[in-house]
Amino acid sequence: MADEEQMERKEEATEIAPFDPTKKKKKKKVVIQDPADEVDKLAEKTEGLSVTESGEASFVGLKKKKKKLVELDPSLVEAGDGEDTLDDQVGEDEQGEGIVLGGATQYPWEGTDRDYKYDELLGRVFNILRENNPDLAGDRRRTVMRPPQVLREGTKKTVFVNFMDLCKTMHRQPEHVMMFLLAEMGTSGSLDGQQRLVIKGRFAPKNFEAILRRYINEYVICHGCKSPDTILSKENRLFFLRCEQCGSSRSVAPIKAGFVAQVGRRKAGT
């Protein structure tokens, strides 16, 4: 009994020991949890989740549940791929509404990683213009005429070699064009055996170009749509220019001969 009493006293003494301020207080270890580890743990936990047909969630451990294969309709399989039949159905609906979406243009760079080229972007701009403003981006042709070929014949004559070719390009009668050229130059001339225009005087190719531009602006180009597809006709002593593109018509001024200097000798008494 005495031994037991001594042991109890020792325990009480240890429990009521005086406070020692020199001793350091033990610090608790702070465990820093990595958020990535937490995400991995959550992913491992959620892998076992599966949704039953009744809509209730059930935990099936860590094993993944196999996905059920979707059975295709035999009618779709006989017709071909499911996507093709769906596309056909959509096309029928669109045609019924009057709006066709399947005709959208596909550009070469779509579905690839390469950069687009300047010509491709230019084509895209014109496609957008044709869709939104068909009048502005119509099939307007640009007429390019060859420059006049001029040769010298002797010292006092000039030969217009490709005169007939330019008349065919403008769709005008050679007599009308020749009358305008001679009136503007203030000289005389005629066609030779090779259908070349021989003019009296010395003229440079620039002179012919300037006169032909004035003739085209006055007797060829339509002032409304700027189209060269016009017809020059004479009605009641007046010339009318009718456009085949826009249908407009206008009267043109008759060709007036300018001042022609008389160089030859005059007869006596006149």
Swiss-Prot record:
One of its GO terms (molecular function) is zinc ion binding. Keywords: Cytoplasm, Initiation factor, Metal-binding, Protein biosynthesis, Zinc, Zinc-finger. This is Eukaryotic translation initiation factor 2 subunit beta. The lineage of its organism: Eukaryota, Viridiplantae, Streptophyta, Embryophyta, Tracheophyta. Disulfide bonds: none annotated. GO terms for biological process: cytoplasmic translational initiation; formation of translation preinitiation complex. Pfam families: eIF-5_eIF-2B (PF01873). Belongs to the eIF-2-beta/eIF-5 family. The keyword Transcription regulation does not apply. SUPFAM superfamilies: Translation initiation factor 2 beta, aIF2beta, N-terminal domain (SSF100966), Zinc-binding domain of translation initiation factor 2 beta (SSF75689). Residues 1-38 are annotated as: Disordered. One of its GO terms (cellular component) is eukaryotic translation initiation factor 2 complex. Its main location: cytoplasm. It comes from the Eukaryota. Eukaryotic translation initiation factor 2 eIF2 is a heterotrimeric complex composed of an alpha, a beta and a gamma subunit. It comes from Triticum aestivum (Wheat).
